[in-house]
Amino acid sequence: MDQPAGLQVDYVFRGVEHAVRVMVSGQVLELEVEDRMTADQWRGEFDAGFIEDLTHKTGNFKQFNIFCHMLESALTQSSESVTLDLLTYTDLESLRNRKMGGRPGSLAPRSAQLNSKRYLILIYSVEFDRIHYPLPLPYQGKPDPVVLQGIIRSLKEELGRLQGLDGQNTRDTRENEIWHLREQVSRLASEKRELEAQLGRSREEALAGRAARQEAEALRGLVRGLELELRQERGLGHRVAGRRGQDCRRLAKELEEAKASERSLRARLKTLTSELALYKRGRRTPPVQPPPTREDRASSSRERSASRGRGAARSSSRESGRGSRGRGRPARPSPSPTGGRALRFDPTAFVKAKERKQREIQMKQQQRNRLGSGGSGDGPSVSWSRQTQPPAALTGRGDAPNRSRNRSSSVDSFRSRCSSASSCSDLEDFSESLSRGGHRRRGKPPSPTPWSGSNMKSPPVERSHHQKSLANSGGWVPIKEYSSEHQAADMAEIDARLKALQEYMNRLDMRS
């Protein structure tokens, strides 16, 4: 139980200073009030039952312990809700009458004891009400002189004892005080040095902070510049990436086209290879055809006229290309299957070929002589056939080396065109010319010259003589005249063209 054991406080009641002492012992409250000016004393003792009954009568019940705490708070002025007041009996009666609302009547005569009694009023203020707890204090009179003298003596003794103790310990106290002061001075000096060092560090930090701020500003500017450059580079990179994406798409499209072209060329190569194999396997020397009859000559003349009409309708570029490729060799029947193999040397065939070349040279000289002198009765027809035939037909079959050289030169020119242009159009033209050349080689031998149709009604002797003159003039060579040299030249040309085509395909593979 937290109760004040003893408390003495100077308190001013109505402008007069009083000393108030409170003592709580168990369930008993002791109060004593003394006037500082007159030394009059008022004292009272109250038990717990009296206090609780008093609070019950006021209408706001308080327990004894709570009442003691309220009294202590009023003396120490620690709470604004409780205050103290000291009233006489007359003041108390007027307060009671004012509270009850009655008129102040004539006061009855009072005794001297009531006039000397004082009432300590504990005022408890709540939000809308004020409650007064009166504590009566009987008058005790002035203090006894004998008691006062005893108190004075005891106080003097205590004072002397304390002074003696002070005299003995004065020097020690001063020395201790000086020592403490010196320690304090040294401590303050060390604190001063620490503060000076801290101030120097603060100044250095301030200077460093200023430099750091300047450096930070410079770095911020650098970062802003780098961010601007980064944005520009990103935009440029996006544009470059877009252009490269377009290039990639274009190149992918070109690659697809090249692959498609490669596939078509491979298919064409496969077709040509198969045709070559068939050509090598199916080569046979056809039997000697009998002289054409009247109906055959009529049909051949019609075919020649139709072929001349189709040839005139073709484009000049393709006609010139075919003319350059076909110049130097006339159309001839397919060679025998033994032409692709390496033949052994035959002296009889060599002698016959040499004699045949000499006869052809003599025929050419005779033709030149007839052309120069105007010729005989059939001279105009022969000269007309020489004019209508291409220059290669006039040279006859005896210039096989020249034809092989022409073929090799055409293959070399095709290779140079493929390597320089790197396009597929030349290859397609080459394949077309190759197919046309193959068809011409595999086709029937050309019909007699156009003017042979006018001799349809001539006797067989004249027709045979006419065929011999055509053979001598280079217009048409019989199948027997198609020797192994011509077959070897055709095979060499086909092999050279296939080799050039294979090289072109390899270059396409390396590019892709």
From Swiss-Prot:
GO terms for molecular function: identical protein binding; microtubule binding. InterPro entries: CCDC61_N. Keywords: Acetylation, Cell projection, Cilium biogenesis/degradation, Coiled coil, Cytoplasm, Cytoskeleton, Phosphoprotein. The modification N-acetylmethionine is found at residue 1. The modification Phosphothreonine is found at residue 285. Changing residue 266 to E: Loss of microtubule-binding. Its main location: cytoplasm. Forms homodimers (via head domain). Interacts with CEP170. Interacts with PCM1 and CEP131. Binds tubulin. The N-terminal 3D structure (head domain) resembles that of NHEJ1/XLF, PAXX, SASS6 and XRCC4. This is Centrosomal protein CCDC61. The gene is CCDC61.
